[in-house]
Every structure is written in C-alpha cells, then in structure tokens.
Amino acid sequence: RQTGVDLSKIKADDAIAKMLPADITERGTLIIGVDPTYAPNEFKDAQGNPIGWEIDLMDAAAAKLGLKTDYRVAKFDNIVPSILGEKYDLGLGGYYDTKKRQETLDMIDFFQAGEQLASPADKPIKEILDICGLKVGAQNGGSAILNFLPKVDEQCVAAGKPKVEVLGYETQDEQTSALLLGRLDAMESDSPVTGYAVKLSEGKLVGSPIFDTVLAGAPVKKDRGEFAEALRSAIESLLEDGTYDGILNYWGVEVGGIQQITVNGATE
C-alpha cells in the first residue's frame, strides 16, 4: 500500500512504552477509529486499506511504542463516543483541538491546519486580499463557504475592492478539475486537502499561505493514565529523527508541520 514511511527503520523506545496503560501493552495494538473520507489525511486505496499521512504517522508512533495498529472504519460522528466508551484508543479524522473538546478528551496536537487557497503556478496568492474579485471554488457546506470567504468579502469591501465570486462544488475533485481547466481563478479548502491537490498537480498549481490556523491532531480519552503523554512523546521522537518531516513531505502537507508536539495546546 502507498506509504511515506519505512516502519522497518523505527526502533521501539522502551522508556516511552512504559507509560502505556496496561491493557494496551497486553493487547499489543492501538485500536484506532478512522473516517477514511478525507484525503490526504486518511482515505482508502483501491484495495480498501486506510492510507494517508495521519495513518503513516500513527503507524510510526505505534512502532515507536512497540505496538501494531488496528484501524476500525467509522463515521466521523461516531468516533469520539467510541473513544469515550473505550471501544477505540484514539481517533483520526482531521480533528481540530478546541477548548470544548478538551473537556472530555486529551488532544495530541501534531499539526497546524487552516484555510488555504490554490491557484495557477503563474498567479500565486500571497495575501488574502489577492482573491478580491476572483472566481474562487469551495465545497458546499464547508467552513470556507460558510465562514471564511464571507469574512474575506468584508475585508475586500473595506479595502475598496470587489467581492470574491464564490462557486460551490459538491466534491474536492470537481473544484480541482475546474481550476485546472481554467474555470476558476483559485480554490479554497482545508490546508491538507489543498496541499495534496497542489502536490498531485505536478507544478501546475501553487498553494497560498495558511490563514486562520488551528492546532489539529488525535483525540484520546482523558483519565487514561499516561497514555496521552506516551503518544505525544512517541510523535515528538519522530519529529526529532526526521520521520515526521519525511511523512509530511511525501503527502504534500509540510506547510502544516509544527516544531513541538503538545497535548491540549489550543487556547480557544
């Protein structure tokens, strides 16, 4: 299966593994709820296996803890209840860290996400006012159409520039195709999705800076001893040895890389 990490090169770290709850150590696996509908974070290959950069990162973190991974495919809305019910140890699904989530969960933050635009390589977007008056594609019902682009409109008007012309699409693939065909000037999505589309375009598209950044990562249940710290330490060691950067680069999401892995780093 497609992967950006060589697990055979990762040595288990006994000092970190000692922090794991006894039930996980005895089981020998991390049970992970995953919603594989969000390329490049987690999605399915032709054989139905979960792949993506968060899958690679969790496989590597598990190897660092001397564990294997057991992915259970689930709907996004069902993952957190299953973590709280201890059916899953953690979840993957592009989770943003928020104060609300921290009430019942510990969020292991290993990424910075936000809103990001892609445009033709010869017309890069350097700052947000660059999109005033442009035709911009976004996904129907997504945060870009509902929140981000209306806020940009206000900034455009305040600066005496024309509003953004927003065109809604049902899927990410449709808006990427429209941009490549010249029907759009730019498209907007979550930064990992935009970064991956840019990577797949083989130089035709270029990404903007990330706007409205938030910390993102994996939720685990509170009160599971040192589990959150074990996971944080495992990913931190992957950051130190270059594995983390290698995975992010492979999947085109390096713009969201962070310098320190934290637990519950969000302040709002």
Language-model features, listed with the residues they occupy:
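Extended ligand-binding regions for polar small-molecule ligands
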Residues: R1-D14, I55-A63, L129-K135, N140-S143, ...
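Periplasmic-binding protein-like
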Residues: F111-S119, G195, K199-E236, E254-E268
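A ligand-binding cleft/hinge motif common to bilobed small-molecule-binding domains
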Residues: G94-Q102, L149-K151, L180-D212
